[in-house]
Amino acid sequence: MSYPGNVHSLRDLYNVFKDAPNRERLILDMNSQLARIDNIAQILTMTEEQEKEVIAKMSASLANLGLNMDNAIRELKNMETVHMDRVSVLTVYQSAVLNITNNTHTISDSMKSIMYDLSGYVNTTIYPTIQSPATEDRSSLIPLNYKNMKNIFDDKHTIVFATVIGPQCVDFTTEDVTNISWIVDSHEIIKITYYPSSLIMETSIVGNRYLQYQLSLSNQTIDEYDNNGPYSCLLVFCVVGANGLLDIYSMSSQQVRKYVNDYEVGESSLIGYSTKHGSLHLSSNDIRNISHELSGSPYIDVRVTYSITAAFPDSQLLSMLLDNIQQSLGTLTACESKSFDDAYRAAMDNQFTKADVLTSSIITMRSSLNSLISSSPLLSDDTIRIVDDCTFQLASALTLTNEFASDSANLLGTFKVKQTTIDRYSNTKISEGKAVYLSPTLATMNVHSGSVVVSTDSFHNNNALKVMLLAPGLVKPDNVNFDLLSVKSNNVIDLVSDYKLDDAIIQFTDQPDYSSTTSIANAKSVVYMKTTGCIGLTYSNPNELILNMSLQLNSAAPSLGGVVNNNTTFSLTIGSTIINYVTDFEITDFTDSSGKQSLKLTSSVNLLTKLSVDMIFYAVSINAGGVIATDTHKYTDTGFDSSNYTYGWEMYDSAALNDYQDMTVVTPPKFTAKMLRPQDASKLNGDCVGGTYKKGRNILVIAGNRIFYNGVSVYFKMQKNSMISLKYFINPSGLSTVDTCDVRITRNAAFLTQIDTKLMSVQSVLNDVQRRIDIINQLMQPSRIQTLATIIQGIGGVVSLAMPLLGAIVVTIGAIVSIADPNHHGVDYQAVLNAFHSWCQYAVVARMNYGLLKADDPKLDILKRISDGSVNTFRNKPKKITLPGIDDEVIRGTSTDYIDTGINVRYNSMGLFGEGKLEEWMANTALKVQDGTANIFQKNLFSLLQKRKIVPMHARVEIIQTEKIGDVYRNTILYAGINEGSYIENSVYLTRSGNTRIKRLNMTSGPGMFKAVTESTTEVGNFKAVDWTLSGMTKEEIYNAAGLMYPNKNPAHSEVQDVYESVIRDMAEIDDTWVLQHHKTVMLPGQIEAFEHLIRVSANKFQYAFIGSNCQNFADDVVGILSQFKRPKRWVDENDFKQYIQSIYDEL
């Protein structure tokens, strides 16, 4: 349908809203006109002469933009005005359109809320098609060019129509039997017969009666029943397959059916349909032979993908989905019926010209833009302010994780002690020894679990700032030892384990009689301490003591992120010492407990960057009775519980020991011991650990509700009116915005907010086309191209700057595509990628085609580069490749994470250093760089070598694309590199013996390619090689790739297949190779084929040199061509590169 010469009714124009990705030119043309008309109502009321002057200006503006609008200009010049109140008529219609837009948001939000609770995953996209109020009839709007409409969820089929069958289809005011039919190419697909006398509605699909409604209008309600019981609604899909045959499906809350020929086949789910096709052939391009009347609700196109889980039966899923659609349709009908009827009657009472139709479309889009503005994120400056002075003991914010196992009885430490034996004759024997300690039941210990809330205020958020202190690994058996902290005779606090032997105040007796429990034979120490002490865990040389702060930004649009302009400071006060830290805030995304995506302001500061700590002492008990003895604990017996390892002490009379009186050695009696559990550390009194510590070591002591640094309490402090300045996008309406994939927000946001410091909202540039073009050109500068590549779903970014109307459509479909975390719900990610591409490709092509880029800039818009979060690994990826022709198989190597999609630059050893240690070191270093385990020196070395393109290895590029075709995954890998595969020939000839065949061979280094294509089998992870003809390679190229001379006699098909599979095997064996660069770039349709052609016509211009033009330079050029549309000028001609771009455009 050309525009606007063949526009015969509003119906033709408003079809544009049905499927935006397939109406690129028409939408952009209309959009561009909209940007040039500021006051449409005022124009409509002008005199004929004034209107002609305005129309002439509009035509000149369109011509200046260079848009392909010749037909529109001619129609505008011939525009005739009629004296009628068109403004009021079109205003009514505009209101109806705005209701449609708002209620589409309602549907999106309603769908989103219901999907959160599903165990399976249902992905539904809704496109509203606006019914015309100014047509001769009110028939269903099935498009003329349906064959060109892509079904974005199933590339084997194209949806012809999808409609809801229910009581809303019936005119209850009639007294005659009514037949309503959907007819395609003279075939009756659906027929509804309504019998007013009995209030029965029968529905038949391809001649078979499907169900019968018994309708009741009592109390203005409709009771719906079919033969199987309660029924909500019926959804019918008609799709045309690639072979031109029509398949028909029906979905109800009870079952899913597929109709084959003249009978139906029941299925329990949407998975595993019969592969048969019906007999309905489509022989005509015009399928608008429709005889039914649809009143009230607008036509809805619904696409559904559905992944079932065992925990959630399909009938419940479908019932929930269909009930929700039915409810949404009812809402639409109630809201819009009267508005449509009013507009319809007003339009039919007056005469409209084609120019009126054009004007009406402009008003329609203005209302859509108003809706976009109301729900589009606005770039906003905000300042978070600390309301009051905040000072608190640092321990109040401490949160720890107890990592001791419940059965822990590990040896925690040993102390140096001296053992004293005294007999009745005052003979004293002193010997050196060790006391060993078994861990108490630390798994049951209550550890710190605190946080502090700091009051803040801001323009858009009034949430509090949450402060938490983390000490990773502090309560972990692998990291800590057990020790005693006590005051020595000189009032210096130190660890008992560090006492000199002469200063030890722990004494052994002869072995006590513990014959009743041999399991604690090692725990037999006697302790006598004259001073207060503390028992705890010691963590030596800690690396981290993290202070985290977070504040949730409720008003922020989560898909766009933000950037922090300046941070504030906080301080630690330790007595008279003050240590200042920068908060280092950033904006990150997260998902709350309800499943809603949000943004929050976060800061993570390691306090040990300025606070020197040699050891952290975490008190687990203080002055527990009998554990540490003081003067008041004489003659106290404390023992052991044989069922739980713990430690205990036995007390002796201090005077007797000190005076060496003649006495009998005290032998502990047998008794029933009680378990000595560590006390709750949060309730301990820290007074006993404050004081003077032994010099030479910095100890941080955590005791109860206080933290001490070398005996002095540590406090956190943040001053009143401290400011944190930031920018982020807010969502005024609270409706869903574009959120199609999980993006790296922190990378995107800084660039988005720096596009234009004066850009405060999308609205500020909607009506200024030139400003939008200038900003886009600025964004496309080479220095910024890499950053722009990640900004693909920014409503306030390039998409809306270039095409505001597209942004409005994306608002509708984007919120549904990102219903929930796809990984969590097991969705097939390829379906989401296909849907996402449909509008990305539109943005790419439309902007290039209509000259919104500079004329001398050959790059396509790199919106097509999907960010890291959107390219997920496929559920079925090639881990094993079966080669049936040569009866072999290949198990993929260690780099399987990179074989689903994207571009790899793979390196392998060239043996330049022989087989010595240097060659081995290079291989090991490459492996570490690939795995992310390399140290700084190794990373820097490889980074330098890669930057200069002199890594002592061979590099080749793997362009990888995985498509899902029905239930089959097709994996295509195009290998490109110097002397790779079938490389380009030049003027060097080789003569075979007998001079029977002369073959050109490449005897110099040059670019080459090989395309390996495999498809999934019924075994997950197993792929097999396809027929070699599907690769697009010739027989000669396959033989060249294998290093074989092409035979004198043309080889058989099977022989070529064997050679093809042997090359796949060689290429697929990736052990001892390393992917040092990976680009998550998804190829546009036709891009790989266009790239192949570009290499073929350009490779002979590539002049190989060991330095400066080697395999690594070529790999870098290939990545630039594919991911950035960057032309390597030294070996690719400009005309060839333009043809590469044009080929992709034509394919799109």
UniProtKB/Swiss-Prot annotation:
One of its GO terms (molecular function) is peptidase activity. InterPro entries: PPPDE_dom (IPR008580). The keyword Transmembrane does not apply. Residues 930-1148 form the PPPDE domain. The active site is at H954, C1111. One of its GO terms (cellular component) is host cell cytoplasm. It comes from the Viruses. Keywords: Capsid protein, Host cytoplasm, Outer capsid protein, Virion. Its main location: virion. Belongs to the phytoreovirus minor outer capsid protein P2 family. Minor capsid protein present in the outer capsid, which is required for adsorption of the virus onto host insect cells. This is Minor outer capsid protein P2. It comes from Rice gall dwarf virus (RGDV).
